[in-house]
UniProtKB/Swiss-Prot annotation:
InterPro entries: Aldolase_TIM, DUS-like_FMN-bd, tRNA_hU_synthase_CS. Residues 1-26, 51-97, 223-258 are annotated as: Disordered. One of its GO terms (biological process) is mRNA processing. Residues 1-10, 223-254 have a biased composition (Basic and acidic residues). This is tRNA-dihydrouridine(47) synthase [NAD(P)(+)]. SUPFAM superfamilies: FMN-linked oxidoreductases (SSF51395). FMN binds at P280, L281, T282, Q335, K407, H438, N487, G488, D489, A511, R512. One of its GO terms (molecular function) is mRNA dihydrouridine synthase activity. The lineage of its organism: Eukaryota, Fungi, Dikarya, Ascomycota, Saccharomycotina. CDD domains: DUS_like_FMN. Its EC number is 1.3.1.89, 1.3.1.-.
Length: 642
């Protein structure tokens, strides 16, 4: 459902009578109230409550990678004083998954494929096995059931390497079973897009890619930067003697930034009014998760954050991030981070020329992670408006018909909001299609609730700007407004409607709330709380598992990757406390529950904070995890009661 006209919250059927909860427990700040009959017995007098570092959802391992994608974290996670286990994040988690014991050459995975030739020239020169009998004898036992990829497409690209091989392999004829009619029928609506072609990737890696759009843009902005830097230094010296008058004059000069002497391409239009938006989420916001969210009502999804420099250099892992499922478009955005206008311009041009299914390119101006901040990326741009504006201008002029959007925070320091000033400058000096504001500062992180009053204040600025543009548009052109989206602490339909009904706010972006409760947009549509049963929630996890295998592959390596990312997903979903066992509503995103017991064993299992139980859940769909499966939870204190 897209909200065309904002409705007062009291007009919505916020919740049915069956979901009303009497407030029989005294309110304890930060503590979720559980009905007494569902409280688990504790083994000590100390009520242990797990602590989460939710900034991890934004970093997703980026705290250990520099702008070029290289590992740069030397903190090895030592034990604290008295040998006690530390709290917080497990840095440098070893997440590499192992493959088959005998590694089969890719040309052998389909016995009927005579066209593909071994890159090494044959079995005698190849480091991989060409002996199918040997490979099948050493291969792990098949997983029970039907291959999810074969079931979806009628054909499994993993061939003999598939962990569900028995479901599409004829042992008598020693041939793979293929339903080519189904494959032809399904592939048009079930495939991945935004896959960079080999020629373009090699050109980027060898610095031979034709950046004919961004090169003049970079040169112009670089010349303007040098002039402005010299002018700024001179004005700062004058300001030290002439006082505030010169400072105000300098600000006026900055506001009258000279436009580039070339025309920006006409952009595709986006409409975010009332859109159900899933925030960019690194690691957990992967393609299978986004695909799941599309089935649960999401209108707009974003890629995981990609770094502009490695994108412009053709770095393979970085180019895996813009990939999307065909069902995500239109409405799919690629988020990038950059501290340099030249890198952002090149990344934007490369995306424009090599992808066909991108609705917007979003500049991350809010990531709080220390490493990116020190490099001048993410939230560091909030304290450097001229640099941010140069980057946006460079992207906008280089991205062809793809519009540019930004995601910001209230500011860098707590109690020092700068977004109003920043947004005014961005509106005056750039042509961003949308601005998303997370209602927290970098310093604040998730220690306090998002400031929605300030989000509304900034929304009014954007609304005034749009009205001013409409008044100035005397020719009656179809001017696309700059959309304004609020973000922070949205965990229910009440939160969503409270946000979208604020003045100047076109829509609301959901982050952690959509990880913990993936059906949140179904609640928005129904305008009431949905007490999902444990079997319904398990069905969502099964769908995620199938999507994960389709994405990463049904071979040993692909299944291990699917299991690892499913565990990452479960590290958020287990935090959901069922509506039916809560003493009062609404539930707050930052509230932590005491240890509780569900209404049945499955509900208790789904709420377990023990990562071993998460692995047990994955085994329902991905088979038994091998002894060599590696998964280390992000948080050292991963259970309510150790």
């Amino acid at each position: 459902m897209t909200v065309q006209e904002k409705r007062p919250l009291d007009e919505a059927n916020v919740q049915g009578d069956e979901c009303k909860k009497p407030n029989t427990q005294p309110y304890v700040k930060g503590m979720a109230a559980i009905k007494p009959e569902y409280l688990a017995p504790i083994s000590s007098n100390v009520l242990q409550v797990v602590e989460y570092d939710d900034d991890e959802a934004e970093s997703g391992g980026r705290e250990t990678s520099d702008a070029s994608g290289n590992n740069s974290n030397n903190n090895k996670g030592k034990k604290g004083k008295n040998g006690k286990k530390g709290r917080g994040q497990n840095h440098n988690r070893d997440l590499k998954q192992k493959g088959d014991a005998v590694r089969l050459c890719m040309v052998m995975i389909d016995p009927e494929d005579d066209d593909t030739k071994c890159a090494a020239g044959g079995a005698e020169n190849c480091k991989y096995s060409h002996n199918i009998e040997e490979y099948l004898a050493a291969k792990s036992d098949d997983i029970e059931g039907t291959c999810p990829v074969y079931e979806a497409l009628g054909y499994c690209p993993s061939g003999l390497k598939c962990r569900w091989l028995h479901s599409h392999y004829n042992k008598e004829t020693k041939k793979l079973i293929k339903d080519l009619e189904k494959l032809e029928r399904e592939k048009s609506k079930n495939h991945e897009v935004n896959i960079i072609d080999r020629e373009s990737k090699v050109a980027l890696q060898r610095k031979k890619f034709n950046f004919d759009i961004s090169t003049p843009v970079i040169n112009f902005l670089e010349s303007r930067k040098q002039k402005d830097d010299g002018k700024q230094n001179k004005e700062e010296q004058e300001a030290s003697t002439d006082g505030n008058e010169k400072q105000e004059e300098r600000k006026d000069n900055e506001a009258s930034y000279v436009e580039q002497p070339f025309k920006v391409a006409e952009k595709k239009k986006i409409n975010l009014r009332g859109a159900k938006i899933v925030s960019p989420l690194t690691t957990v916001g992967n393609l299978p998760y986004r695909r799941l969210m599309k089935t649960l009502g999401a209108d707009v999804t974003y890629s995981e954050m990609a770094l502009a420099v490695p994108l412009s250099q053709g770095h393979r892992p970085e180019w895996a991030l813009p990939k999307a499922h065909v069902t995500e478009y239109p409405g799919f955005g690629v988020q990038i981070a950059s501290s340099k206008h030249w890198a952002a311009a090149k990344a934007a041009e490369a995306l424009y020329k090599t992808t066909l299914h991108v609705s917007e390119i979003n500049l991350n101006c809010g990531c709080p992670i220390d490493l990116l901040f020190k490099q001048g990326q993410g939230s560091a741009l909030l304290d450097s408006p001229p640099r941010l504006i140069r980057i946006v201008k460079a992207m906008n002029a280089s991205s062809g018909d793809i519009p540019v959007t930004i995601k910001i925070r209230t500011g860098v320091k707590e109690n020092k909001n700068t977004a109003v000033h920043l947004v005014n400058r961005v509106l005056e000096e750039t042509q961003v299609a949308a601005i998303t504001l997370h209602g927290r500062s970098r310093q604040q992180r998730y220690t306090k609730e998002a400031d929605w009053d300030y989000i509304e204040e900034v929304g009014k600025v954007v609304k005034t700007w749009n009205e001013k543009r409409e008044d100035e548009d005397k020719e009656g052109r179809d001017t696309n407004p700059t959309w304004f989206v609020g973000n922070g602490d949205v965990y229910s339909h009440e939160d969503w409607y409270n946000g979208v009904n604020r003045e100047g706010v076109d829509s609301v972006m959901v982050a952690r709330g959509a990880l913990i409760k993936p059906w949140i947009f179904e609640e928005v549509e129904a305008q009431q709380y949905l007490d999902k049963s444990s079997t319904e929630r398990l069905a969502m996890l099964e769908k995620y598992a199938k999507y994960a295998v389709e994405h990463w592959g049904s071979d040993e390596y692909g299944v291990s990757n699917a299991r690892r990312f499913m565990c990452e997903f479960l590290s958020f979903t287990h935090r959901y406390v069922p509506v039916g066992i809560l003493e009062r509503l609404p539930a707050k995103l930052n509230e932590r529950p005491p240890k509780w017991i569900g209404r049945n064993d499955l509900e208790t299992l789904l709420g377990s904070s023990d990562y071993k139980d998460w692995i047990k859940i994955t085994e329902m769909f991905l088979g038994k995890a091998g002894d060599d499966f590696l998964f280390i939870p992000k948080h050292k204190s991963n259970s309510y009661e150790n």
